[in-house]
């Protein structure tokens, strides 16, 4: 029996990673399905395989609860670009997954139901998008076909979202003539999914994709840097070996390249024996691409989500770091009370979370209050691949309580040196 040959991925236009973010039930998955349907039917340079709502929201527990838990990946093309799109979860309990999804975005489509306006999760997703490096956001105000809405209400919703985005450091373009925001689109994802030829239906998808093409800037890809990819998932393929998937953060990889698997466990050396993108072979994976990489001789159980694949010797695992953090206020969804030296939250680096202990500066306050901005020393339970500049989120009990950036790796510092700078509080053993 002949083996079916893999298709070759055709890289014929600029590539961008994008995704939907926003509050639960505001229509992110419906919009994602509507985009694929529009691109599959429109012609004129638009291309996609239609993905129905149920196909995107595909795990049984997701459909039963009516919410998206894990991130789903789809692809489509406009006349200008090729998009890899992640549909991010919106439920507060699954912000951990949202962080993973948002880490794979160059830009985002913020979905806001016009009937509700900006909600708590809307605000947290905007904040998280900024923290994980999403460069640009366009807005889709959904459910604009509702009889509950009038022009005045929609203008209020638009104004609120605009203020929210600007306050988090996102720029929104303004029309010079009428002051409107062309990156804020009104529509109905359901009307579009049902194929309605109207301004709120398919017309809104056309406008949305045009706004993505125009206002979400193509990022500068770190193609020339040392290869680095966070491992999001690991699969075992019978007869071929182990495949790891993720977004290439920098550099390039091709068949035959030697790589290291770094973080959490002992560093392992292996070789790339294949690169795929959307189940199609690619000659070379480049920074910004979501890929699957086949590894020679690596066992499924020896590799895990949260490790990184990298050029040998280019990045190393660490447990001790000095970081600058900002803590969230109660209004932003953070802690209601402060914390002291010895605080033990979860730290999220790229695609992994690890427990760590946060210690406060010796010359600082005794307690960190919500909204504070300061330097801390962190000691992680497990070594994580990181370097100066790496970003992370801080979570506790299902709530994002802060975010930070690595200022210095401190593994080489002695306990005495660290104790001169930070209030080291050790647990007393009985």
Swiss-Prot record:
GO CC terms of this entry: cytoplasm
Pfam family, one: GTP_EFTU_D3
InterPro entries: EF-Tu_GTP-bd, EF-Tu_GTPase, EFTu-like_2, EFTU_2, G_TR_CS, P-loop_NTPase, T_Tr_GTP-bd_dom, Transl_B-barrel_sf
Chain residue ranges for the region called G1: 22-29
Annotated segments matching region G2: 66-70
Region: G3, residue numbers: 87-90
Domain (tr-type G) ranges: 13-220
Keyword list, A-Z: Cytoplasm, Elongation factor, GTP-binding, Hydrolase, Magnesium, Metal-binding, Nucleotide-binding, Protein biosynthesis
Residues annotated for GTP binding in this entry: 22-29, 87-91, 142-145
Keyword Metal-binding: yes
UniProt binding sites for Mg(2+): 29
Keyword Metal-binding carried by entry: yes
Top-level taxon of the source organism: Bacteria
Localization in the cell: Cytoplasm
Intrachain S-S bonds: none
E.C. numbers: 3.6.5.3
Chain residue ranges for the region called G5: 188-190
Function: GTP hydrolase that promotes the GTP-dependent binding of aminoacyl-tRNA to the A-site of ribosomes during protein biosynthesis.
UniProt family annotation: Belongs to the TRAFAC class translation factor GTPase superfamily. Classic translation factor GTPase family. EF-Tu/EF-1A subfamily.
PANTHER family cross-referenced by the UniProt entry: ELONGATION FACTOR TU, MITOCHONDRIAL, ELONGATION FACTOR TU-RELATED
Subunit structure of this chain's protein: Monomer.
Identification of the protein by name: Elongation factor Tu
Organism: Neorickettsia sennetsu (strain ATCC VR-367 / Miyayama)
Taxonomic lineage: Bacteria, Pseudomonadati, Pseudomonadota, Alphaproteobacteria, Rickettsiales
């Amino acid at each position: 029996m002949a083996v079916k040959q893999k298709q070759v991925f055709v890289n014929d236009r600029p590539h961008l990673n994008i995704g939907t973010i926003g509050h639960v039930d505001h229509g992110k998955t419906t919009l994602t399905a509507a985009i694929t349907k529009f691109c599959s039917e429109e012609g004129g340079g638009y291309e996609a395989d239609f993905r129905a709502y149920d196909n995107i929201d595909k795990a049984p527990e997701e459909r039963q609860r009516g919410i998206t838990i894990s991130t789903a990946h789809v692809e489509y093309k406009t006349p200008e670009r090729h998009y890899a799109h992640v549909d991010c979860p919106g439920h507060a309990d699954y912000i951990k997954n949202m962080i993973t999804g948002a880490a794979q975005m160059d830009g985002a489509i913020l979905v806001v139901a016009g009937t509700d306006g900006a909600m708590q999760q809307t605000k947290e997703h905007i904040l998280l998008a900024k923290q994980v490096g999403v460069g640009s956001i366009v807005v889709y105000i959904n459910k604009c076909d509702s009889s509950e809405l009038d022009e005045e209400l929609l203008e209020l919703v638009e104004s609120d979202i605009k203020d929210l985005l600007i306050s988090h450091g996102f720029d929104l373009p303004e029309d010079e003539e009428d002051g409107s925001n062309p990156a804020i689109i009104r529509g109905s994802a359901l009307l579009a999914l049902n194929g309605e030829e109207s301004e709120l239906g398919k017309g809104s998808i056309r406008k949305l994709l045009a706004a993505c093409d125009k206002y979400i800037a193509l990022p500068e890809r770190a193609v020339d840097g040392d290869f680095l990819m966070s491992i999001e998932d690991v699969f075992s393929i019978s007869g071929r070996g182990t495949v790891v998937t993720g977004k290439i953060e920098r550099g390039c990889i091709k068949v035959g390249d030697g790589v290291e698997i770094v973080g959490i466990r002992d560093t392992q050396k292996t070789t790339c024996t294949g690169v795929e993108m959307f189940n199609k072979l690619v000659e070379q994976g480049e920074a910004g691409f979501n890929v699957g990489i086949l590894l020679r001789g690596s066992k499924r159980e020896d590799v895990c989500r949260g490790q990184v694949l990298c050029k040998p010797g280019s990045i190393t695992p660490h447990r001790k770091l000095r970081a600058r953090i900002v803590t969230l206020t109660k209004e932003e969804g953070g802690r209601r009370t402060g914390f002291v030296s010895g605080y033990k939250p979860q730290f999220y680096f790229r695609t992994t979370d690890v427990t760590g202990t946060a210690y406060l500066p010796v010359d600082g306050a005794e307690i960190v209050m919500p909204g504070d901005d300061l330097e801390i020393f962190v000691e992680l339970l497990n070594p994580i691949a990181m370097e100066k500049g790496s970003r992370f989120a801080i979570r506790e009990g299902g709530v994002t309580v802060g975010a930070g950036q690595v200022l210095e790796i401190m593994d080489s510092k002695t306990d005495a040196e660290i104790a001169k700078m930070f209030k080291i509080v050790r647990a007393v053993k009985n």
